[in-house]
Amino acid sequence: MAFTFKQFHIDDMNCGMAVGTDSVVLGAWAQLTAAKTVLDIGAGSGLLSLMAAQRCQAHITSVELDTSAAEACQHNFHNSPWANRLTLVNSSIQEFCQQIEYQEYFDHIICNPPYFEQGTQAIQSQRAMARHTDSLSFTALLDAIHVCLAPQGNASLILPMQSMARLNEILAHSPLSLIEMTNLISIVGKSANRVLCVLAHKTHPQIATKISDITIRELSGQYTQTMVQLIRDFYLKY
């Protein structure tokens, strides 16, 4: 399926995961303004990378394991206004971290990671890979962030609320810490079902975790004003 945003176009037909609200919110919410280098782990169609390219002047490196998704991602990059600042690497993040030429620090890392650690695999293999942590465990993801993140850099993720206990369990023994979390509420009156997270090295000066909420829709089904402000630079409707 194809999606047209204000400044770029996405074709995600050969990608395991289609363009969705999770990635759009993460791409609009991540604090990218000062970043000169950005790493997108599990780039898929390239949506997060393209949103980052629109929002800041950074050079963006996008790592995608699946070959079909990587081809779609490269196509989307080539047709964007920022092709000269977007670099695609078709490999696992583990292989990426081991390549000497890529052992550099990134000011910001962004990722909408696989989130089903257990359960029945999806029938479509690409979708299964995109949705299950079999292809990228939390531990492997945090190890990659630790290796690639600049000393004062941040990493932005979006996770299901039920994954937070596991994340915190791993962080307790990790050189990374959770410095910010924004609870994402689908509609007024509901409990949060997603969490936007910011990770940093434990040497980061900020210690206490900053906590906030974002509600996506009013009871009427319309986007809240907070959500509109977040996405207005991307959605044609606004």
UniProtKB/Swiss-Prot annotation:
Any one GO MF annotation of this record: rRNA (adenine-N6,N6-)-dimethyltransferase activity
GO cellular component: cytoplasm
InterPro entries per UniProt: DNA_methylase_N6_adenine_CS, rRNA_Ade_Mease_Trfase_CS, SAM-dependent_MTases_sf, Small_mtfrase_dom, tRNA_Adenine-N(6)_MTase, tRNA_adenine-N6_MeTrfase
Predominant subcellular localization, coarse grouping: cytoplasm
Enzyme Commission code: 2.1.1.223
A GO BP entry: tRNA processing
Keywords: Cytoplasm, Methyltransferase, S-adenosyl-L-methionine, Transferase, tRNA processing
Reaction(s) catalysed by this chain's protein: adenosine(37) in tRNA1(Val) + S-adenosyl-L-methionine = N(6)-methyladenosine(37) in tRNA1(Val) + S-adenosyl-L-homocysteine + H(+)
PANTHER family: TRNA1(VAL) (ADENINE(37)-N6)-METHYLTRANSFERASE
Family to which this protein belongs: Belongs to the methyltransferase superfamily. tRNA (adenine-N(6)-)-methyltransferase family.
Name of the protein this chain belongs to: tRNA1(Val) (adenine(37)-N6)-methyltransferase
Species of provenance: Shewanella baltica (strain OS155 / ATCC BAA-1091)
